[in-house]
Design a protein with these regions (language model features):
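Repeat-blade elements of multi-bladed beta-propeller folds
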Residues: 187-191, 223-245, 266-290, 314-340, ...
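Gly/Gly-Pro-rich "capping" loops immediately C-terminal to redox-active cysteine motifs
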Residues: 42, 46-53, 67-100
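Conserved blade-ending motifs and adjacent loop-strand segments that build the rim/top face
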Residues: 448-450, 455-458, 498-504, 532-534, ...
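Aromatic (tryptophan-biased) beta-strands that constitute blades/sheets of beta-rich domains
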Residues: 160, 164-221, 225, 255-264, ...
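The canonical Cys-X-X-Cys-His
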Residues: 52-67, 116-120
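Flexible coil segments in periplasmic/lumen-exposed cytochrome c-class electron-transfer proteins
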Residues: 38-39, 106-194
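Electrostatic cytochrome c docking/interface patches
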Residues: 34-55, 170-174
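Short, conserved, GDST-rich strand-edge loop motifs in beta-rich repeat architectures
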Residues: 330-341, 399-423, 559-586, 674-700
């Protein structure tokens, strides 16, 4: 495990900002500044530049500006910022960036990209040279770009610092106490606070005025795979976007303050956010690094590379880091890799590894006898997809663990005394001591999962009346749409609530929570069986919200099933194949919001609609909950009744957690759209099947692309 501290002449995010904005379509930032070199410098012909201008006007000017000046978060391709970043950079890097344009890449031929490069150089003051070979991106990869700076490097730094300082200097250090009980104005974690309740005490936007919400600002983003979770502190929004890029944004108006992009050769993968603690931002990357950045400048402080035994393939960092005290905890997903996933804890100041908890126990360890006698080299899964929850009083961090895809060897138990096929700690809640990584308790919600029906999502810490006492509980739902409540201190089973969308579990023991499996759903490669819920999950990645004032939990659900049998695609190794199927009880609906009274263990209300719910649910003290769907509608509901009080059509699918915050006495509502994920793609396919069967139109109007949308109320009239 390696941790590197990095210092550079110019902090990369500041230099990246300069007088330019962040790139929304592609990252026009070379990976390193070129040192003085005797390498050849590229040149171009006037003919190339003239042709390049025509191509630029047609294909690029609408985003990057007629004069290459950029707009909003689309970068400029000229001027001081561009010159500083690209002077002396390898031609190969410019070629890579150009070939990704327009968004989606590959729309122009190689000659067109060469002519575009020539025009960009010409616009930046580099003279054509007819006595040298024309620019040839494919043949001149070892060449360097010419100097375009004219000694402007120092001026750029001072200009940037002056532009961002006024907002960034207001940032105060984030403490454990703030993460446990954030200032009302802030949204400091993926689900706002350590308890993951997804609830804000802000109430300026309420039932009476929510219909007056209007767009305050919109920032375009680069399209790509992402599950973004904005966090806001002291008027600054920190946003992790595609590809592996952190933005610091003025939360009042959407102005970019700084930007940091992690460069790697690995294709950027979807993430669920970043973390704040002290004066640092903690970032997971697609090539298995965890970074610490300065919250005020974006400067890299340390870089920890997570070591694996078999390289990077098959591993991912999906969740936001989770910080408690002086430990930065990061879950690792391991899809089909021997020995499975784990949680690692890093020292907050140095990035050095402190402890590691393996989610699949080794033979001879507690739980090691639950893998049907398989050697550790044949055990896989146990991914950690989501950030944890933390209770300060109990000093326990709670995580969920995913199942394995290698289900075949576990399907039937072996006849060996002391060996079972439960497959710990898959589908379990694990409670860890954050200081040592010691396992304090665990509870397995569904043993020997043969259907990819994860119980891997957010753990929420709540306090509710139960059995004549006030109990602190950890609650979560799995893909089946069954909620389990456990005692937070001991893991003792309390109760379950079934949303009625599944047929796999036929009975739940009221004392232990043990789930009896319906024998008609056990995988059989020779017989097609209807399995509900789908492995996409009735409950999945979008987190729920809990209102502590009313003891109500608000859950986003989607109704769907699978046919498991001899036809379809092979996800698991039991021999069955899977094909999408509709829920026979859908009655023309697929999306659902369920309100649960956890104090009474009763259903409060239910809202159903045709389109799947795609975003998180967010609750506020204004008596509202918010949710967004696949048809690009963002809605506000009355938390008491489920009545729709406001809705607006977005220009793309709301694919993030919904958050709220306040700056200078004004409450804002924010959501990101247009950055896709497994979840969005899966339910888009399910909805297409559903709409076709139900004869419903599909919203196929042009999409506006990835962006952050922020709403607020109109100014009050005096």
């Amino acid at each position: 495990m390696q941790t590197r501290f990095k210092k550079r002449l110019i902090p990369p995010p500041i230099a990246a900002f300069a007088t330019t904005m962040i790139l929304a379509h592609s990252s026009f930032i070379p990976s390193v500044y070129a040192q003085a070199t005797a390498g050849k410098t590229v040149s171009y012909t006037e003919t190339q530049a003239v042709a390049g201008k025509l191509i630029y006007d047609v294909s690029c000017a609408s985003c990057h500006g007629v004069n290459l000046e950029g707009a909003a978060v689309v970068p400029n391709l000229s001027g001081d910022g561009f010159a500083v970043k690209w002077s002396g950079a390898p031609v190969a890097e410019l070629a890579t960036k150009l070939r990704q344009m327009p968004p989606g890449g590959g729309r122009l031929n190689e000659q067109a990209y060469e002519e575009l490069a020539a025009y960009i150089l010409a616009f930046n003051g580099v003279a054509a040279n007819s006595n040298t070979p024309p620019i040839q991106l494919g043949l001149q990869s070892g060449y360097l770009l010419p100097d375009m700076t004219d000694g402007r490097r120092v001026a750029i730094v001072s200009e940037i610092a002056a532009g961002a300082a006024a907002v960034l200097e207001k940032l105060s250090p984030v403490s454990d106490e703030m993460l446990n009980n954030p200032p009302a104005e802030d949204w400091l974690l993926w689900q706002r606070s350590y308890d993951n309740q997804g609830y804000s005490p802000l109430d300026q936007i309420d039932r009476a005025n929510v219909a007056d919400l209007r767009l305050s600002w919109r920032m375009p983003l680069q399209a790509g795979d992402n599950n973004p979770g904005p966090i806001i502190h002291d008027g600054v929004m920190f946003f992790f976007t595609f590809p592996d890029t952190v933005l610091a944004i003025d939360a009042i108006n959407g102005a970019l303050l700084w930007r940091y992009q992690h460069e790697s050769d690995v294709r950027a993968s979807q993430k669920k956010g970043i973390a704040l603690h002290g004066d640092k931002v903690f970032v997971p990357t697609s090539d298995l690094h965890v970074l610490a950045l300065s919250a005020k400048t974006g400067e890299l402080i340390w870089d920890h590379e997570i070591e694996t035994e078999v390289g990077l393939s098959g591993y991912n960092l999906r969740s936001a880091p989770f910080v408690v005290g002086d430990k930065v905890m990061q879950g690792i997903t391991s899809l089909r890799i021997a020995k499975g996933g784990w949680i690692i804890a890093l020292d907050i100041e140095t990035g050095e590894a402190e402890w590691r908890f393996n989610t699949i126990p080794r033979p001879g360890e507690p739980g090691g006898n639950s893998w049907n006698g398989l050697p550790i080299e044949e055990r896989s899964g146990g991914s950690v997809w989501n950030a944890g929850a933390f209770d300060r009083e109990l000093n326990l961090a709670y995580f969920g663990v995913a199942p394995t895809y290698d289900t075949g060897p576990l399907l039937y138990p072996v006849d060996i005394d002391g060996i079972n096929n439960d497959a710990l700690y898959t589908n379990a809640t694990i409670a860890l001591n954050p200081e040592s990584g010691e396992l304090v308790w665990y509870y397995q919600h569904l043993a020997n999962d043969q259907w990819d029906l994860d119980w891997a999502f957010e753990r929420q810490i709540i306090t509710i009346p139960y059995g004549g006492q006030t109990r602190k509980a950890v609650v979560n739902l799995g893909k089946l749409g069954i909620l389990d409540a456990l005692d937070a201190a001991s893991g003792e089973y309390l109760f379950s609530m079934d949303m009625g969308l599944q047929n796999v579990v036929s009975a739940i023991d009221p004392l232990t929570g043990y789930k009896t499996i319906n024998p008609e759903t056990i995988p059989n490669p020779e017989q097609t069986r209807l399995i509900c819920s789908t492995h996409y999950g009735s409950k999945s990645w979008p987190p729920s919200a809990f209102n502590p004032r009313t003891n109500r939990l608000y859950v986003s659900l989607n109704e769907g099933c699978i046919e498991a049998g001899p036809e379809g695609y092979e996800l698991l190794t039991s021999g069955v194949r899977l094909a999408a199927a509709l829920n026979p009880d859908s009655n023309g609906n697929m999306g659902r919001i369920q309100a649960l009274d956890l104090g009474q263990q009763q259903f409060a209300w239910r809202y159903r609609q045709p389109s799947p719910i795609i975003s998180s649910i967010m609750a506020t003290a204004g008596g509202l909950i918010f949710a967004g769907d696949l048809n690009r509608i963002l809605r506000a509901f009355d938390e008491e009744t489920g009545e729709i009080l406001w809705e607006t059509r977005l220009d793309d699918v709301p694919s993030s957690t919904i958050v709220t915050y306040a700056v200078d006495g004004i409450q804002y509502l924010a959501v990101a759209v247009g950055q896709t994920s497994y979840y969005v793609n899966d339910w888009s396919r399910m909805y297409d099947l559903f709409a076709e069967q139900e004869g419903m139109p599909i919203n196929d109007s042009p999409k506006g692309g990835a962006a952050i949308w922020v709403f607020s109320l109109p100014p009050r009239k005096n």
